[in-house]
């Protein structure tokens, strides 16, 4: 993701903070909101990855505690010429994964226990290669910042609703604006997720296939994860829906309404593109020796 795109998204988030601040306390509230937004943007840049990992109760693992997963990630980073990220595991039966971090030097990848149980070593390698492609493309900064700030906007809107806001009778926007903001803020959070270009997922699919050298590994994994995500809930994702776009497959897919605001391309389309890669650009055999067999 480009620096320009990051700047535009942060500016949009700041604008929403200012609007809510004005509704809460007029011009004084807007100034306070501006200061808070500036501090929050800086805090999110340095700490949003930690916050997202904490939201999902992720625990860091190493070569001793998760040798298979750690070994796969290490081998893939060597293939891709990337620094070794921190590796995390999330205790949930839904198979899924995501990457986070402001740059490749400060990146983290997370896999669920359900993912490690459901996939073959080859499929797991395909998924982790996809996440490392996000790291390589610097998608993780934008994805993590928007997840953190979208959640913050919703919380601030709830604060405005429950604690009154600007009751100045000379301000006709007060009561009406408060109601509008209460309704629009959650929608804005979902729209931010959709603003992350779906082309980033396609690009990470291709990048992951190039890193591991086997597009069909990821194609098979996506099909398995898609089926499981519709039948197994992800409690931490349900509690933090603004982070849904971080995952390789929408963790909220078990609910029909979530499909109206889907943050991911069609899994069928992604699989079709990967199969085309397998018979086209990446059809030549690649070395397969590694922790996956």
From Swiss-Prot:
InterPro entries: HtpX_protease, Pept_M48_protease_HtpX, Peptidase_M48. The keyword Transit peptide does not apply. Keywords: Cell inner membrane, Cell membrane, Hydrolase, Membrane, Metal-binding, Metalloprotease, Protease, Transmembrane, Transmembrane helix, Zinc. It is found in: Cell inner membrane. Binds 1 zinc ion per subunit. One of its GO terms (cellular component) is plasma membrane. The chain crosses the membrane at residues 6-26, 28-48, 145-165, 172-192. Its EC number is 3.4.24.-. Belongs to the peptidase M48B family. PANTHER family: PROTEASE HTPX (PTHR43221:SF1). HAMAP family: Pept_M48_protease_HtpX. This is Protease HtpX homolog. It comes from Rhodospirillum rubrum (strain ATCC 11170 / ATH 1.1.1 / DSM 467 / LMG 4362 / NCIMB 8255 / S1). The lineage of its organism: Bacteria, Pseudomonadati, Pseudomonadota, Alphaproteobacteria, Rhodospirillales.
């Amino acid at each position: 993701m480009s620096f320009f795109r990051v700047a535009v998204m942060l500016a949009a988030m700041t604008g929403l903070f200012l609007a809510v601040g004005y509704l809460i306390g007029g011009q004084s509230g807007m100034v306070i909101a501006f200061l808070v937004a500036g501090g929050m943007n800086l805090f999110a840049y340095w700490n949003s990855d930690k916050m997202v990992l904490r939201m999902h109760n992720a625990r860091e693992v190493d070569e001793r505690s998760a040798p298979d997963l750690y070994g796969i990630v290490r081998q893939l980073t060597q293939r891709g010429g990337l620094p070794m990220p921190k590796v995390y595991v999330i205790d949930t039966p839904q198979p899924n994964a995501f990457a986070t971090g402001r740059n490749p030097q400060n990146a983290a990848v997370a896999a669920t226990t359900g993912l490690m149980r459901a996939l073959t070593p080859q499929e797991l390698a395909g998924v982790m290669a996809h996440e490392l492609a996000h790291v390589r493309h610097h998608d993780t900064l934008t994805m993590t910042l928007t997840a953190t700030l979208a959640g913050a906007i919703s919380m601030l809107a709830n604060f405005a609703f429950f604690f009154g806001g600007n009751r100045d009778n000379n301000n006709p926007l007060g009561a009406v604006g408060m109601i509008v903001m209460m309704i629009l803020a959650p929608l804005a959070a979902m729209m931010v997720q959709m603003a992350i270009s779906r082309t980033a997922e396609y690009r990470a699919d291709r990048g992951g296939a190039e890193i591991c050298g086997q597009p069909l590994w990821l194609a098979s994994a996506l099909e398995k994860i898609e089926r499981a995500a519709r039948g197994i809930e992800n409690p931490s994702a349900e509690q933090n829906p603004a982070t849904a776009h971080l995952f390789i497959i929408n963790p909220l897919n078990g609910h029909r309404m979530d499909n109206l605001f889907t943050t991911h391309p069609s899994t069928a389309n992604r699989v079709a593109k990967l199969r085309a890669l397998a018979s086209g650009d990446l059809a030549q055999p690649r070395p397969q020796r590694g922790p996956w067999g």
